[in-house]
């Protein structure tokens, strides 16, 4: 307190306290001060406490949406297409020789064996690698996390795939019980951690736990053999949370609102009318008796109603359905949903209205979000699986490593997935040509931008050109027989002067005529 506050506190302590309180309020942020119109909502629990309470409920709600909500199904399908794609994560081996050049012999050997193993990589033998990766991604985004055990060596009931004794055992998050927590042993939600919060081992149920987790036998799997892909928004979070958590309420409200509008439209579509009578007919004691008379009227196109009595007319029920504002309201809600799930509005809503520039701008912005999810998947699944598979294949003698290989680069590889689609292929292709000619990109980058593997494309391209030359076939797709670009450029240069001269002559004639 300053001198004035001390003096006031001696005479009126309550006044001094009020002054200090007011000074503290002035220094604080406005958002930190609760008011009648601003109700403060706080979250002071750590990530594990929050997930322990609501994680399972959110996961079950997200699964219900994936089964019953068309918008969620479409959004997750689009995530599969944009993050994993039809061919899965493409792995291009990049081992180098001691001279620093690419070891093409070893790379081709690894690539061939990897393709054979990718036909049936899981323990069930039901999925190819791209299908398994898409299921892992969908489980990760919907449930918040997914587990997969890497099984290597001789195992009863399992046959080596392409000569490599290595498999994947994918598991939903229910197999790692979240109820298993013991602070004395540093066990948090089914995962043992060391003092640095690095996972040591996982408690895994041997069968589907269902509702009776305590009755199911469990096993302990070392962390080095377990892949754990989780979606987190906070540090030091042991288990993942579904991607749909921030938008669950909005999605449920939108579904119920659409159901109500659809039901109202069905009711209004049922044509209804009524017979209106005048008051004079009702009050007249001689009015006809309608009790025994059939008043059902058969109506069809061109019908002339002759059964109406004097003083009666036909009235119809007016309907305001379907709601004219439903489309705009729905689109606004879908924009909010797309922002909450790191997706593209046009892809989720299937609304592709707009100019080329607007569509491409949205693709550019949305692609970064897909790239982040893709990078997380590669870091947690694709890279560990490839490196463990390669080590197992070398140990099993399936792959021979040449003596001139730089062993420090043995596990090097380029991982790539789906890239941003091309709205106008001609514009995109011309842009890539300019980048390559300017030295800002490579031909491999161009091939990857189309979702292909550079080595595979070059191999097939060379075989195609060699076969055409062998058969004496000439197409303009062979650059050796397409000097048209230089001819066009030369003709433009040669004709430029004539065109300019012709233009000058025409302008001179125009000026002469005007004079």
Where are these regions (language model features)?
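Surface-exposed loop-to-helix/strand elements on domain peripheries
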Residues: 101-108, 305-423, 455
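Extended, charged amphipathic alpha-helical segments
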Residues: 227-362, 403-405
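Short coil/turn segments at secondary-structure boundaries
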Residues: 127-129, 151-152, 264-270, 348-352, ...
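C-terminal anchoring/interaction modules
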Residues: 2-20, 361, 376-515
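A broad, structural surface signal
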Residues: 108-119, 135-142, 146-149, 153, ...
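Structured, mid-chain assembly/scaffold modules that mediate subunit interfaces
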Residues: 73-232, 435
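Short, Φ-rich (hydrophobic/aromatic) sequence segments
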Residues: 66-94, 132-140, 244-264, 377, ...
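N-terminal-proximal low-complexity accessory segments that begin disordered
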Residues: 1-97, 508-515
């Amino acid at each position: 307190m300053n001198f004035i506050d001390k003096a006031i506190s001696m005479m009126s302590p309550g006044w001094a306290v009020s002054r200090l309180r007011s000074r503290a309020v002035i220094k604080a942020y406005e958002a930190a001060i609760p008011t009648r119109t601003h109700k403060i909502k706080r979250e002071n629990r750590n990530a594990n406490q929050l997930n322990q309470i609501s994680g399972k409920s959110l996961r079950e709600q997200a699964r219900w949406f994936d089964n019953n909500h068309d918008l969620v199904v479409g959004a997750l399908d689009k995530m599969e297409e944009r993050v994993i794609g039809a061919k899965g994560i493409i792995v291009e081996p990049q081992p180098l020789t001691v001279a620093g050049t690419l070891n093409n012999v070893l790379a081709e050997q690894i690539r061939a064996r990897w393709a054979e193993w990718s036909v049936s990589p899981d323990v069930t033998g039901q999925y190819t690698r791209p299908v398994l990766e898409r299921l892992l991604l969908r489980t990760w985004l919907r449930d918040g996390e997914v587990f997969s055990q890497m099984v290597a060596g001789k195992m009863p009931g399992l046959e080596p795939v392409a000569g490599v004794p290595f498999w994947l055992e994918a598991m939903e998050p229910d197999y790692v019980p979240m109820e298993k927590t013991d602070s004395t042993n540093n066990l948090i939600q089914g995962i043992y951690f060391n003092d640095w919060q690095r996972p040591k081992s996982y408690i895994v149920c041997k069968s589907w736990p269902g509702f009776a987790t305590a009755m199911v036998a469990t096993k302990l799997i070392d962390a080095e053999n377990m892949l754990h892909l989780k979606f987190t928004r906070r540090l030091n979070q042991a288990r993942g949370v579904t991607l749909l958590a921030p938008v669950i309420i909005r999605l449920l409200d939108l579904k119920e609102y659409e159901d109500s509008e659809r039901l109202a439209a069905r009711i209004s579509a049922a044509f209804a009318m009524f017979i209106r009578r005048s008051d004079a007919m009702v009050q007249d004691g001689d009015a006809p008796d309608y009790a025994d008379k059939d008043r059902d009227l058969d109506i069809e196109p061109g019908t002339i109603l002759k059964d109406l009595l004097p003083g009666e007319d036909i009235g119809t029920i007016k309907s305001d359905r379907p709601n004219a504002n439903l489309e705009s309201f729905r689109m606004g809600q879908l924009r909010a949903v797309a922002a909450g799930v790191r997706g593209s509005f046009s892809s989720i809503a299937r609304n592709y209205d707009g100019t080329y520039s607007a569509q491409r701008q949205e693709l550019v912005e949305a692609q970064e979000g897909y790239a982040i999810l893709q990078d997380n998947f590669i870091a947690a699944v694709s890279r560990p699986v490839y490196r463990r598979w390669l080590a197992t294949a070398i140990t099993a003698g399936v792959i021979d490593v040449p003596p001139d290989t730089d062993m420090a680069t043995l596990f090097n590889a380029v991982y790539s997935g789906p890239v941003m689609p091309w709205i106008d292929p001609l514009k995109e292709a011309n842009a890539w040509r300019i980048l390559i000619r300017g030295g800002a990109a490579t031909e491999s980058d161009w091939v990857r931008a189309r979702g292909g593997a550079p080595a595979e494309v070059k191999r097939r391209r060379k075989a195609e050109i060699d076969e055409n030359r062998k058969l004496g076939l000439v197409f303009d797709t062979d650059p050796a027989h397409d000097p048209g670009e230089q001819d066009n450029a030369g003709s433009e240069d040669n004709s430029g002067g004539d065109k300019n001269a012709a233009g000058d002559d025409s302008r001179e004639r125009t000026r002469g005529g005007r004079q």
